[in-house]
Amino acid sequence: MKHTTLFFAFIFFTTIVFAQTDFKGEVATAKKSYTSGKLEDAHFALQQALGDLDIIIGKEVLKLLPTQLDSLNANTNSDNVTANVGFIGATIHRDYGTPEKKAEIEIISNSPLLGTLNAFLNTPLIGGMLRDENNKTVKVQGYKARLERTDAGNGKFNYKLDVPFSSSLLTLSVDNSTESEILGMANKIPFQDVAKLIQ
């Protein structure tokens, strides 16, 4: 448990440090390092610049997301974009509502989970074996998605929808909800516009 906590703390702080660099400055450093033959420094500066670019794109994606899902207003003060560590991409987060009734959108560009989720969605044997009353495959705006239901313990259900699109994974989570409500919310998300921006 101690090792897991330390690992996640390291990832968190590395992400924050990685996210605080300057795009134009890193590109200038990369050019200067390349011209002087310091290829390792040029490579590092370009990686930093790509991380900055992912954050800039993530902030533009937040502008595309709806300010309201059903009756839940966006809590834009908690909007967050962080650079992914270890691979290129960003995690984009927005939540809606109040603690009593909330929804969350997370978009992970270049998600490492895409391969597994696509295998689940596109292989009938695997998808069929893992399907039950709490898991099923649905379509949202033409994209296959995995819908998962968990008991909220109060006679209601929490839903989670995983939608792989382009090279990204969007997860919509809604507490105390119904299947029709979460699918209605998902249909308000501009997947095509987000996909064009993230590519």
Name what the model sees in each region.
Residues L64-T150:
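Short, solvent-exposed recognition patches
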Residues M1, E106-I107, F157-N158:
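Short hydrophobic/aromatic-rich motifs at helix boundaries and adjacent loops
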Residues M1-D22:
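Bacterial Sec-dependent N-terminal signal peptides
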Residues K24, A28-S36, E40-T91, G184-Q199:
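N-terminal "mature-domain start" segment
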Residues K2-T4, G25, R94, E148:
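Solvent-exposed, well-ordered amphipathic alpha-helical segments
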Residues Q20-K31, T35, A45-Q47, E133-Q199:
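A short, solvent-exposed beta-edge/loop patch
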Residues F7-F8, F13, V81, L147, ...:
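A broad, structure-centric signal for solvent-exposed, well-ordered loop/edge residues
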